[in-house]
């Protein structure tokens, strides 16, 4: 019997944007390669609700491969403005509430996978009462907003992020009885269990674009930080590196990623040794990783290595993250610093230290234990269909 699944993503899946959009792209690719029909429901700003299929209208912002492999793609507008304000739902979730999406999902009997907290409030709709729904959380939203609250200086922003943290926790608790969860690690599972005092929670490791090491030996040319710069937390991490690490460390530092804010662009070009490369193509981004001497990927929210750090391990030379990344099998592949000054000390030690063949061999042995996307797809299918 032909298997089909509805996947809901708050953003258009993209292989060139580390984070949720990238993970959604790879899980769709794995499912389609396994012969499973994927019906993708996604959001974009200032868009009318349109459907894109092999025979239908092609959304120019959608990756051509998605149009080729998905059974259907339907996009909806992201809600903006004060009308999204609610005393019970965080703004981050209210902007994805859409009655037409609920009606479209009610038309079939396929299981539903919601990617991230954003669109998850639709699980409360009475029209979807009889649906089997899973929510895959790659980031624990209350912790995410708590980090933004801590890093924000403006009182109103602090209050806003505090409110988002409280409401997102309430929302996750509210839908816990309605959905099943998928998280990337045992530590993430423990976090949810402590919040929900139970719940149906499965673990599924992060998908990846390759299981090979292409790192080059010798010396690179600069330090690099990369990520989804449109994301508030990634933006603040980039600002932290500029203002706390490279403000008085005159080592070449490059930031790259999609849609950086004008303020970040201005800050990155204030010093002669720092710069930003906005919206690189996939080949350009890979080239920057391969030519870097040090990959910097602090992780202030997630417990384990994120997608950008894993890319650095597989394609780059020396990698540095912070001390919150603990208990990881990838630990031999990176250095850890607990503070800005610790980052500076490690950078000074490594910047003129050639990357060796021995270090590459260590990474190859560790990466060899990774599960392939094919194996992860099989695990996912077992979670959904048993």
Located regions from the model:
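Acceptor-binding helix/loop patch of EC 2.4 sugar-transfer enzymes
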Residues: 78-91, 131-167
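Membrane-proximal helix-turn-helix segments that form the acceptor-binding/catalytic region
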Residues: 26, 100-106, 141, 152-181
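Short N-terminal targeting/anchoring amphipathic segment
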Residues: 103-121, 132-134
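Acidic donor-binding loop of glycosyltransferase active sites
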Residues: 290-304, 317
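Conserved catalytic-core segment of nucleotide-activated headgroup transferases in glycan assembly
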Residues: 203-270, 276-283, 290
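N-terminal subdomain of nucleotide-sugar transferases
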Residues: 1-70, 247
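Helix-loop-beta element that forms the nucleotide-linked donor phosphate-binding surface
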Residues: 125-131, 173-208
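A charged, aromatic-enriched C-terminal amphipathic alpha-helix characteristic of glycosyltransferases
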Residues: 96, 354-385
